[in-house]
Design a protein with these regions (language model features):
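Structural motif
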Residues: 86-96
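Serine-esterase "nucleophile elbow" of acetyl-processing enzymes
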Residues: 21-82, 95-104
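Bacterial N-terminal signal peptides that target proteins for export
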Residues: 1-7
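Generic structural signal for helix capping and beta-alpha/helix-loop junctions
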Residues: 56, 88, 189-190
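Hydrophobic h-region of N-terminal signal peptides that target proteins for export
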Residues: 11-20
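Amphipathic coiled-coil/heptad-repeat helices and related helical stalk/stem segments
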Residues: 31-32, 63, 91, 164, ...
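Alpha-helical cap/lid subdomain in secreted, periplasmic
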Residues: 73, 94-223
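Active-site-proximal beta-strand/loop segments in catalytic clefts of secreted hydrolases
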Residues: 49-52, 81-86, 112-115, 183-187
Length: 223
């Protein structure tokens, strides 16, 4: 099951290549044949931020990770910072480490996080808080201060959406001109890692009454 999930994940990330159909092929280091185009990520340097799904130390060489497949298919150089068990509140730390060690040489960043937020029953929360403020405005008359409601992003590690707000803000500040790809949590099957770590499949709610769908939809709203 896990192997199939990894393969599906990698295929989805590489879908721009697949969508070109039969007239499109991955070009190697040799010149492309007429009618073929090179995948835009071919030969690029990509940072991976995540949890056990990307952690190079998790399961060793027994299970290939998504970045292994992309390295093979697209000759990508992977900079992997995923750590097993981490949640969205670890994104800033991993991003800082990526920036420190590779700076501007990274071409794109992939974030695959969220399944542990669900499993740990982190409340989904809301994106914004509203408050009344005065703002200068004019609509065909002399400008003046008006009182209007304003929405402000909630920056808190107490909720899932608050963590995403913090993580994305951090990534944009560190890598303002880089492509950032957010991937949703994968489907969850029953996972038993011992007497004190048994995770039911996705047909069950977590302890705060949410299905994994809510965590998937939250990330989809960021796109």
């Amino acid at each position: 099951m896990k192997n199939r999930q990894f393969i599906v994940f990698a295929l989805l990330l590489a879908c721009p290549l697949l969508l070109h159909g039969q007239e499109t092929s991955l070009c190697g280091k040799e010149s492309c044949n007429k009618g073929y185009i090179r995948h835009p990520w071919y030969g690029k340097k990509v940072g991976y931020i995540g949890d056990s799904i990307t952690d190079p130390n998790c399961y060793g060489d027994n299970i290939k990770k998504c970045w292994d497949f992309l390295k093979e298919w697209l000759d990508i150089t992977p900079y992997v910072y995923g750590v097993s068990g981490r949640q969205w509140n670890d994104v800033p730390r991993q991003a800082e480490q990526l920036k420190k060690e590779h700076g501007e040489e990274v071409d794109a960043i992939v974030v695959l996080m969220g399944t542990n937020d669900f499993n740990s029953s982190v409340p989904v929360g809301t994106w914004f808080a509203e408050k009344e403020e005065q703002v200068m405005a004019a609509r065909g008359e002399t400008k003046k201060l008006e009182t209007r409601k304003r929405r402000v992003p909630i920056m808190t590690n107490d909720t899932y959406k608050g963590r995403i707000n913090i993580g994305l803000s951090h990534l944009k500040k560190l890598f303002p001109d880089k492509q950032i790809v957010l991937l949703t949590p994968l489907h969850r099957s029953l996972a038993e890692f011992g007497e004190k770590n048994v995770q039911p499949d996705e047909s069950y709610q977590n302890k705060c009454g949410e299905y994994v769908d809510a965590y998937v939809q939250a990330l989809m709203a960021c796109t």
